[in-house]
């Protein structure tokens, strides 16, 4: 009996030590912010209704918050990766100004098959609906897909999530907080 108890304790400890995180992955344009096509400047940024509250709610429920976004404007030559990164930094600064916790990570795909910038003009596994960004985030951040969600305004967002083993949630406008509360455990 003592041996069985020790084995059970070992299994429990292994589970505790290997516990994976859960996450809510958000698409950016059209989900967290109003889609203005090829957004890269903070002065053009506008949160969707109750997006800040949705981010904060996810944190309160114990989820990591991760942005997963296609940024084909890089491949098209409209803006640079540095400008994408500056906007993401600004988003977290804006969250802090509003008293909210920051987004835990940003993953973006700069590629597009018809891009004008040769280095980015290609097919890839990261551009949604492919699951590459989600799979990379799960690996790098120790996220368990089965306990996680992908929230986006496009069927390709939901498809990318499902291909990665993540539950997809289609955001159709209105309060992002209401969408999250209705669909996320």
Where are these regions (language model features)?
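Leucine-biased recognition of intrinsically disordered, low-complexity hydrophobic segments
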Residues: 3-4, 17
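Asp-based, Mg2+/Mn2+-dependent phosphohydrolase catalytic module
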Residues: 16-22, 82-104, 113-150, 154-185
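Active-site neighborhood of HAD-like aspartate-dependent phosphohydrolases
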Residues: 16-66
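Acidic active-site catalytic centers that drive phospho-/nucleotidyl reactions
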Residues: 27-29, 70, 153, 157
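Short beta-strands and strand-loop turn motifs
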Residues: 35-36, 67-72, 152
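Short glycine-enriched, charge-decorated loop/helix-capping segments at active-site entrances
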Residues: 37-46, 80-82, 120-124
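Substrate-recognition element of Asp-dependent hydrolases with the DxDx(T/V) motif
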Residues: 51, 55-91, 102-112, 161
């Amino acid at each position: 009996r003592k041996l069985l108890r020790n084995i059970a304790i070992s299994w429990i400890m292994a589970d505790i030590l290997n516990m994976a995180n859960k996450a809510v992955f958000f698409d950016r344009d059209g989900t967290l912010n109003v889609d203005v096509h090829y957004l890269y400047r903070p002065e053009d940024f506008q949160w969707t209704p109750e997006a800040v509250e949705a981010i904060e709610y996810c944190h309160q429920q114990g989820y990591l918050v991760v942005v997963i976004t296609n940024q084909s404007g890089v491949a098209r030559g409209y803006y640079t990766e540095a400008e994408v990164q500056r906007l993401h930094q600004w988003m977290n600064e804006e969250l802090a100004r509003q008293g909210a916790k920051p987004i835990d990570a940003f993953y973006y795909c700069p590629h597009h098959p018809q891009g004008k910038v040769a280095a980015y003009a290609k097919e890839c596994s990261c551009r949604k609906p492919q699951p590459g960004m989600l799979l990379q985030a799960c690996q790098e951040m120790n996220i368990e897909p089965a306990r996680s969600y992908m929230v986006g305004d496009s069927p390709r967002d939901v498809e990318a999530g499902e291909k990665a083993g993540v539950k997809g949630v289609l955001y159709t406008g209105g309060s992002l907080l209401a969408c999250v509360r209705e669909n996320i455990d």
